[in-house]
Every structure is written in structure tokens, then in C-alpha cells.
Design a protein with these regions (language model features):
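Helix-loop-strand module that forms the ligand-binding subsite of alpha/beta enzymes
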Residues: 1-91
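Glycine-rich phosphate/pyrophosphate-binding loop and the adjoining helix
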Residues: 78, 85-161
């Protein structure tokens, strides 16, 4: 994938558990070893020797662009948006742009029973999500054509882990 868009609710200032599980699995995409034979499967001593011998921490997702939309009905949307965008930036992904990184409240402090109706009525939020997706598409096209380059390309990371 050239780009990733995460759209999620906030639950008590946190990401939903399924998103947390995905993030945990993606640790292998940020410095992980694609060659299981080099560690004999999962032999920890071989893995430690390999790392201490000068592991390059390959960033398999670096250079891909991203968009994040976080929505909630009471609290925590801004915190979660920052957590997700910081994490994606930390692993070398590129934010698509201002309109692609949003946090919004839908049906603020209204009953759960009306949340679907609140979403249907909130056409501004729907436009925000649409703009986030369109911004991501434009960033993907710019990245593929070489017009969008990370400003830190070619620099050596002093502390790669």
C-alpha cells in the first residue's frame, strides 16, 4: 500500500482494542526481520546476536503517506489523533496534509441510542472525512510521481531504534 487511512472512534481516550492489536503487530514492519532463517525461526539468542552485530532496523513502512480521522462523542479525540499521527510519523510514514489529520466530535454528549442519527445529520463531519481521503489520494499520487519527498531523506538517523 502506498497510503494508509485510519478512521476510528475514541474509547475513553484510547484506540479501540482491534486497532491497538494492529499497531502491536506492525512492530515487525518497523525494524523487524523479514528472514526467519537468520534466527532459526525464533531463537532469542540468535536474534540477540544478529541485533548486536549491527542490525539496521529497516523501516518497511517508511515513505508511505497517511491520513487519520478520529471521532468521538464525549472526550479524547485530540489525544488519540496525536498518538496515532506521532506513531505513524515515528515509523517514517509521511502525513498527507492538514486536511488529512482530523479529530471531531459527533453527537457531543448525546445518548448512544441516537449516535447513528447524529452521524447521518453531521454532513460537515462527512465532508471532513471525504477531504481526508481525497488529501490522502493526492499525496499518494504526488509520492508515486516523485513530487512528494520527505524533507529528511538521505539523513542518517542517530538513534534508529
Amino acid at each position: 500500500a502506498h497510503g494508509v487511512m485510519i478512521v476510528c472512534p475514541v474509547n475513553w481516550y484510547q484506540a479501540p482494542s482491534s486497532l491497538k492489536l494492529m499497531i502491536d503487530r506492525l512492530v515487525c514492519a518497523d525494524g523487524g526481520n523479514p528472514d526467519l532463517s537468520s534466527t532459526g525461526g525464533k531463537d532469542p539468542m540468535k536474534a540477540k546476536r544478529l541485533e548486536l552485530a549491527g542490525w539496521p532496523y529497516p523501516r518497511h513502512l517508511a515513505g508511505r503517506v497517511f491520513s487519520v480521522v478520529v471521532h468521538g462523542d464525549a472526550a479524547g479525540t485530540e489525544n488519540l489523533r496525536r498518538i496515532l499521527t506521532d506513531w505513524m510519523s515515528d515509523i517514517g510514514m509521511i502525513p498527507s496534509g492538514h486536511l488529512a489529520l482530523i479529530d471531531r466530535y459527533v453527537g457531543y454528549l448525546t445518548p448512544y441510542a441516537t449516535s447513528h442519527d447524529d452521524l447521518d445529520r453531521d454532513t460537515d463531519f462527512q465532508d471532513d472525512v471525504r477531504n481526508a481521503a481525497l488529501t490522502l489520494i493526492q499525496a499518494i499520487k504526488a509520492r508515486r510521481s516523485g513530487q512528494l519527498q520527505p524533507a529528511d531523506r538521505g539523513l542518517h538517523e542517530a538513534r534508529p531504534k
